Amino acid sequence: MEGIIFDFNGTLIFDDPINMISWKKYAKRKFNYDLTDEEYYKYNGTPGETWIEGITKGKITGKEATKCREEKEEQYREDLSNAEIDLIKGAKEFFNELKKNNIPFTIATSADKENIELFFKKFNLNQWFDLSKCAYNDGTFKGKPNPDIYLIAAKKLGVDIKKCVVFEDTKSGVKSGYSAGAKVIGMIAGRNPEDIWKFEKVVDVINDFTEVNIEKLNQLFK
């Protein structure tokens, strides 16, 4: 194993309840649209523009959809800033283990720059991660489920994506990871483990980061 790449939302923090509320608030305020739980999970893990196009039945696309996504993310940042939430159990200890063993690791998230900057501030991520090596939605590449974001993250780390482990919690994220060539582990994130095992090509499923270690991950490549 040469490196590890983490998705963020739903993988390093369980923020589904916060993000769901943010999307429902925004959809109602902006479009007078009542977003259902089923729709939330349908779009979860995809770029915000995909949500907007779906909510508006394709009436809003392109730059206008990007503007709407940015407005929604302002709502999310406000909601997250006010929430009492921490990194998933075992994450900090796992980061420390990776640092101690000089294993490169980074984040690949569909979130935009403002969001990842908030994540770094709220969760003190600077002690483990280099922001310049994180991949996030800057509008220059296709979002998940396309493989681009994980290929970019691996390149920033200077590692071979085919020798990386990716941690993901959504169907589109898992597809992005394995399409790039990585081994993908599914994060349960409070859901039924059987639902995560249904995601194509996951090599393992975990509840939190107390269930993984370097030795176990290295076995995936033998």
Positions of predicted regions on the chain:
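Short glycine/serine/threonine/alanine-rich loop segments
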Residues: 32-33, 103, 159, 182
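N-terminal helical cap/lid subdomain that shapes the substrate entry/recognition surface
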Residues: 2-93, 97-101
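Ser/Thr-glycine-rich phosphate-binding loops at phosphate-binding pockets of nucleotides
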Residues: 11, 15, 109, 173
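Asp-based, Mg2+/Mn2+-dependent phosphohydrolase catalytic module
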Residues: 1-2, 96, 112-113, 118-222
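Conserved SAM-binding loop
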Residues: 12, 87, 105-108, 166-167
